[in-house]
């Protein structure tokens, strides 16, 4: 990344949706009821079905001085079939930097854990791979003391795949170090999602459109 100084903000396109590159297909609200989750239990691995929604909200461009990021604010809500109470809730941002084609996915869950996965993809790619690893300064993982002791997260990998029919699927593998369990335990999640609500434009784009239709005298 080339820049004259670290303070001067680069110009940003208010139309975030047109600048999202490879993550653009994710914008909108999605539903999936084919989820399969394999997680650790005292008696060994347990596999259960789940139902979920992913809500990717188009947000305004973000400047770090000369760096410009375009992204989606997301919320994941997961329940077991036939239940209302969530057994997994997740929020974060999915960010794309057009200049470097880098993608950053942040994660925060109410179990007391945060992470940021990183990857690279080009506009039009049918697959996105992201990786986070404990101890890394950029794509790292940070957990509360209990999780560090009992379910140490070593790495988090997520793959998004975009299908011709407009759906997307994902696979996640979270590698854990658990006392009494030999080797690393692979906690896996996978589902296929279909859109239930189209994306809405970001506030800056709405404002830009209003100004164009009603220019100031």
Predicted regions, residues:
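Internal, hydrophobic beta-strand segments that form the core of beta-sheet-rich folds
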Residues: 166-176
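Short, surface-exposed beta-strand/loop "edge" segments at domain boundaries and coil↔beta transitions
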Residues: 80-87, 112-117, 137-141, 178-183
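An exposed acidic His-Trp-rich patch
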Residues: 98-148
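Short, surface-exposed charged micro-motifs
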Residues: 53-55, 93, 118, 157-159
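Amphipathic/hydrophobic helical signal segments and adjacent flexible N-terminal regions
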Residues: 1-71, 77-81, 152-155, 175-217
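Exposed beta-sheet edge/beta-hairpin loop segments within beta-rich domains
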Residues: 21-22, 146-164
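Aromatic- and glycine-enriched beta-alpha-beta binding-site module
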Residues: 70-114
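A short, structured loop/turn motif at beta-sheet edges
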Residues: 64-65, 96-101, 119-129, 160-168, ...
